[in-house]
Amino acid sequence: MASATRKDLLKKVYNMVPPMLESFHKGQLGRVAVIGGSEDYTGAPYFSAMASAKLGCDMSHVICEPGAGAVIKTYSPNLMVHPYMRQSKNVGQNENIESIKSEVVAMLSRLHVVVIGPGLGRDKLMQDTCAEVIQEARKQGIPFVLDADGLYLAQTRPELVDGCTECILTPNVVEFGRLAKAKGVNVDEGDPSELCSKLAKAFGGVTIIQKGAKDYISNGSQTLISEGEGGLKRSGGQGDTLTGSLATLLAYRKAYHDKIWDHGTNMEPSETLALAAYGGSCITRECSKLAYKEKGRSLQAADLTEHVHTAFLNVIGEKEETPKL
């Protein structure tokens, strides 16, 4: 698949996206959650969850700190916000740390995909809670995406993700360097695609999207390069559109493998995970391009959110016909 053209790859992503059928019920096209959002950071989980919603998942949740939850609820009534997380200093006298963790972990049974990290921060209890979420997600076979301070978990506790083929890491250049250092990979040797492959292999086959002028996507055995045109403004928060897009595409991937519609194709899980990563990258880059064309140097992360659906139509396209079950 590494030698496939952009057109070929996006056609496969198209094949993985469910059509819109009357027979589907609420939740079948994706139940995703973003775990993050703390006192200081409320925008990131919102941007991620809204990208998931705008790309078409049925149910988009945010699991966050109460202080963040009250704010995020005012951003959009379309998101389901659960203030179950706690920063260490905000644990109430009548609250038990283990019960806080278990309440978050209990949400997993309702979800198809989890994004961990947007607005999370590095508070120990927040990090420890997410560590337990990762362990339980692996047990249940739930795909997850790590970004921002979720990547700090992969850096400081690599055993949490080692060997997990249902995990996507989305580091920028600085975060990539930290992960490489944690795994003893020399970032000064080799070209970017080789380094991405080497780091993915060092983590035992996780999928890494190394964000940059080009996005390098690798699981250690195959590498894809996403180099569609993006915008020139590097405002913070654009990576949250990527994580949200990945979440919905991973949910569509589950629908594909569950065969909730007759798609007539038979791609392997390793291939569809790579395709979800590639599709998410392409959609995000298209969002950036569209938003930059409209806003120029004033572009902010929120501007990408409004272009998610158009980017999907431009890059992947809607099903022209709705096949029968």
UniProtKB/Swiss-Prot annotation:
Q: Which UniProt keywords apply?
A: ATP-binding, Cytoplasm, Lyase, NAD, NADP, Nucleotide-binding, Phosphoprotein
Q: Name one Pfam family in it.
A: Carb_kinase
EC primary class: lyase
The positions annotated for binding (6S)-NADPHX are 119, 172-178, 240
Q: Where in the cell is it found?
A: Cytoplasm
E.C. number, please?
Answer: 4.2.1.93
Query: What biological-process terms (Gene Ontology) are attached?
Result: metabolite repair; nicotinamide nucleotide metabolic process
> Which residues of the sequence carry a binding annotation for ATP?
211-215, 230-239
Q: Which family does it belong to?
A: Belongs to the NnrD/CARKD family.
Q: What does this protein do?
A: Catalyzes the dehydration of the S-form of NAD(P)HX at the expense of ATP, which is converted to ADP. Together with NAD(P)HX epimerase, which catalyzes the epimerization of the S- and R-forms, the enzyme allows the repair of both epimers of NAD(P)HX, a damaged form of NAD(P)H that is a result of enzymatic or heat-dependent hydration.
Q: What is this protein called?
A: ATP-dependent (S)-NAD(P)H-hydrate dehydratase
Species of provenance: Phaeosphaeria nodorum (strain SN15 / ATCC MYA-4574 / FGSC 10173) (Glume blotch fungus)
